[in-house]
Swiss-Prot record:
It comes from Shewanella sediminis (strain HAW-EB3). It comes from the Bacteria. NAD(+) binds at D32, A33, E34, Y35, D36, S81, L82, E111, R134, E171, K290, K314. Its cofactor is Mg(2+); Mn(2+). Its EC number is 6.5.1.2. The active site is at K113. Signal peptide: none annotated. DNA ligase that catalyzes the formation of phosphodiester linkages between 5'-phosphoryl and 3'-hydroxyl groups in double-stranded DNA using NAD as a coenzyme and as the energy source for the reaction. It is essential for DNA replication and repair of damaged DNA. The keyword Magnesium applies. Zn(2+) binds at C408, C411, C426, C432. CDD domains: BRCT_DNA_ligase_like (cd17748), LIGANc (cd00114). This is DNA ligase. Residues 591-670 form the BRCT domain. Belongs to the NAD-dependent DNA ligase family. LigA subfamily.
């Protein structure tokens, strides 16, 4: 029995250490298979010896008996809210108030304002005891069993320098990937979708059945200490130092926390986080700015229900209510018919929005939306604005159903919807003017043939004036014909014709991407080019051959097979080749020459000796995958001049970093 007890103790300790490395350090220390082997062994031992199960065992996060209701908990110390500022002028006023009341220039601790649910977690002698929601600030709901299921929250504190009684405050969030997965599962079951990750986190945390909470992949970030007893316990003299103490005790703390010594640094931090907002793993709605010195915090005190020493600098709102005035139907380059909501203009996400996507007929039905409804519009970063919900109680009696068209609104061809697909498509192909325009815009775009000066308006005029009907027609244009376009003189026309001529020299990958085959993006086009080497092999391939290509699944293989089986598509391809579009032959590369195969690289900053696209292509030619963001799976970051947050994150994760000269050495095989 003693040996079993020791093994359980050892497994619990080892697994908790692995959890810490994974959730707090973001640096997994063992493969998933090894972790699964260890935890399965622990589950087996605990099942056979339940009396030996330890309170901090990672197996105790699966959820327990469902509750009838939530009990109330009175907070040992009120959980206050923060005042907000919405502009630089308002922040300047906050800074002036702080400076006037402190004896020295304050240093601020800045961190992302997480958009989740605030919770209080209590530990006694280093062991998890209870958790509560913020509630009204004085009284919250007892969510002890639900919080226990969150893997990133320690059930037993690390180290030994923690106080006998410790209250930790932080935000429970649902990571974006977990939110997408949750809604995908709900959609597959025909269940109601969550509007945003915050609602999903709140709904998951308030489940009476903690097993449901355990299934929701919630996360947690600590942002403050609450009650500490004894009060004389030695703690950091600054907020940032206290956050680092929390991290040492096993709590996740945002890697974006930063000390800022003056107004400019704070504003730069705000601008940087706002710019990178969409790349973060979690939703945020601003930054929290706190006076770092605990002494100064005590000196400044509180006003009403908020501290004087902190504020939330909010981002422009991402969701607003407005009126749905009508619906138009747009046709894309692949024939997809998309309903677009015409809205009463509303300022959201930093811009005025008057149109938003409704995605497809299924989404219209799911929302239950009608023309005349008051709707909630969301705009996040560069994402196209979308209608995410209706305000049912504001629906007027005159609201009208939205009728999806049976024929194309542009060419009057039949609209068809393939079984199993959400998107309805016009069957007109290049006969459809809308598809023709979008197809040629795509073909001439920067990532395809990169025709310099061939903007959307030029393409639209070329088609409207019947100068171009297919991509190959671009290469037959003359300068005199181009002068028929608005604001196009002979000099500009000659320059554009020269740019079109230059675009004939391309790469096989760019050519394939430019064809606009459904779901064939840049990376897939490059993989297809590297696999087949030439056009004839590609055109004669079947689905079984396509599926052998990296990143090509059954659906993309089906799209490729269908595309090259259509005579009119083959005619488009052949006409382009006959018009003079060509590319260098791709030589067979020996396996041993793919020195970076299986590696993930990221480029950041400005490269001065090498074009970024060339660098990307050369890395891919050596077998590397070139990603857009740094993660624990990144093998190497190339940092050019003025490298920013990606470099910082790579250094935090211990990712190998090369400068441009280092990259050139790798490409040269040194």
């Amino acid at each position: 029995m003693h040996a079993i007890q020791e093994e359980i103790k050892q497994l619990t300790s080892v697994l908790n250490e692995h959890n810490y490395r994974y959730y707090v350090d973001d640096a997994p220390s063992v493969p998933d298979a090894e972790y699964d082997r260890l935890i399965n062994r622990l589950k087996q031992l605990e099942a056979e010896n339940p009396e030996l199960c330890l309170p901090d065992s990672p197996t105790q996060r699966v959820g327990g008996v469902a509750l009838a209701k939530f009990n109330q908990i009175t907070h040992l110390k009120p959980m206050l809210s923060l005042d907000n500022v919405f502009s630089e002028d308002e922040f300047d006023a906050f800074y002036k108030r702080i400076s006037d009341k402190t004896s020295e220039t304050p240093t601020f601790c800045c961190e992302p304002k997480l958009d989740g649910l605030a919770v209080s977690i209590l530990y006694r002698d280093g062991v998890y005891e209870r958790a509560a929601t913020r509630g009204d600030g004085s009284v919250g709901e007892d969510i002890t069993e639900n919080v226990r299921t969150i893997r990133s929250i320690p059930l037993k504190l690390r180290g030994s320098d923690f106080p006998p009684l410790l209250e930790v405050r932080g935000e429970v969030i649902m990571p974006k990937k977990a939110f997408d997965s949750l809604n995908d599962r709900a959609r597959a079951k025909g269940e109601k979708l969550f509007v945003n990750p915050r609602n999903a986190a709140a709904g998951s945390l308030r489940q009476l059945d903690s097993k449901i909470t355990a299934s929701r992949a919630l996360g947690f970030y600590a942002y403050a200490l609450g009650v500490v007893e004894p009060e004389s316990w030695p703690l950091g003299k600054g907020h940032h130092e206290q956050l680092m103490q929390l991290k040492s005790w096993g709590f996740p703390v945002s890697s974006e926390v930063k000390l800022c010594g003056d107004v400019k640094t704070v504003l730069d931090y705000y601008a940087d986080i706002l710019e990178r907002r969409e790349a973060l793993d979690y939703e945020i709605d601003g930054v929290v700015i706190k006076v770092d010195s605990i002494e100064h915090q005590l000196q400044l005190g509180f006003v009403a229900k908020a501290p004087r020493w902190a504020t939330a600098f909010k981002f422009p709102a991402q969701e607003e209510m407005t009126l749905l005035e009508g619906v138009d139907f747009q046709v894309g380059r692949t024939g997809a018919v998309t309903p677009v909501a015409r809205l009463k203009p509303v300022f959201v996400g930093g811009v005025t929005v008057s149109n938003a996507t409704l995605h497809n007929a299924d989404e219209i039905a799911r929302l239950g939306v009608k023309v005349g409804d008051t709707v909630i519009v969301r705009r996040a970063g560069d994402v196209i604005p979308q209608v995410v919900a209706i305000v049912a109680e504001k629906r007027p009696v005159s609201a009208n159903d939205i009728l999806f068209p049976q024929t194309c609104p542009v060419c009057d061809s039949m609209v068809e919807r393939t079984e199993g697909e959400a998107v309805a498509r016009c069957t007109g192909g290049l006969f459809c003017e809308a598809q023709r325009k979008e197809a040629i815009k795509h073909f001439a775009s920067r990532k395809a043939l990169n025709v310099d000066g061939m903007g959307d308006k030029v393409v639209e005029q070329l088609i409207d004036k019947e100068l171009v009907a297919s991509p190959a027609d671009l290469f037959r244009l003359t300068a005199s014909a181009m002068t028929m376009l608005d604001r196009m003189g002979m000099k500009s026309a000659t320059k554009l014709v020269a740019a079109i001529e230059d675009a004939k020299q391309t790469t096989f990958a760019r050519f394939l991407y430019g064809l606009g085959i459904r779901e064939v993006g840049e990376a897939t086009a490059a993989n297809l080019a590297n696999y087949f080497k030439n056009l004839d092999k590609l055109k004669s391939a079947d689905a079984d051959e396509f599926i052998k290509v990296d990143d090509v699944g059954a659906i993309v293989a089906q799209h490729l097979t269908y595309f090259f089986a259509q005579p009119h598509n083959l005619e488009v391809v052949d006409n382009l080749v006959q018009a003079g579009v060509h590319w260098p032959e791709i030589e067979e590369v020996a396996e041993e020459a793919l020195s970076l195969k299986g590696q993930t690289w990221v480029l950041t900053g400005t490269l001065t000796k090498l074009n970024r696209n060339d660098a990307k292509a050369q890395l891919q030619a050596l077998g590397a995958k070139v990603a857009g963001s740094v993660s624990k799976n990144t093998d190497c970051l190339v940092a050019g001049e003025a490298a920013g947050s990606k470099l910082t994150k790579a250094q935090d994760l211990g990712v190998k970093v090369l400068d441009e000269d280092g990259l050139l050495a790798v490409l040269a095989g040194e």
